[in-house]
Design a protein with these regions (language model features):
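Conserved, single-site charged/polar hotspot
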Residues: 1-152
Length: 152
């Protein structure tokens, strides 16, 4: 479905190179790996290996769309759940395989909230403040190299 919307950024591994071509129907995902992140830490390139082929998904928007199956529920920090029918809330996440005794049976996507992955994370700033860091320390963390001064 996403290939039809943006085929130049949904690529198939063929003879050692990625190219734009229709995606074959597959029944099993064998691996998911984030291979590139943007400056803010958002997933920017993702490789999905399946029983029928390997695919590279480029851009945080495409990644959020491809990984959102429309039925999986998102568990928020407060424990509440919400349905995400079309798009994951953010590309700021890690992926961890879920195992039974021996086999991978699924993947957990552990995210960093709603956002675009640039600037200051509200959750991050809040947690830093709860750990005792001051406003200047928090701002310097998120905006490295900036100088904080009084306006005159």
């Amino acid at each position: 479905k996403r290939y039809e919307a943006n085929g130049k950024l949904i690529l198939t591994l063929k003879d050692g190179d990625y190219c734009s071509q229709d995606i074959k129907t597959f029944s099993k995902v064998t691996d998911i790996t984030i291979i590139k992140r943007g400056p803010g830490g958002v997933a920017d390139e993702l490789v999905i290996a399946t029983d029928k082929g390997t695919y590279k998904i480029i851009s945080e928007y495409n990644i959020r769309a491809v990984l959102c199956d429309g039925v999986t529920r998102v568990v928020r920090q407060d424990g509440s759940e919400v349905s995400m029918p079309n798009l994951l809330p953010s590309a700021f996440f890690v992926i961890e395989p879920s195992h039974d005794k021996k086999n991978v049976v699924g993947y957990n996507i552990i995210g960093g909230g709603f956002g675009h992955g640039v600037g200051m994370s509200q959750n991050g700033a809040k947690n830093m403040a709860l750990q005792g860091l001051g406003a200047e320390q928090i701002l310097n963390f998120f905006y490295e190299g900036c100088e904080i001064c009084s306006e005159q």
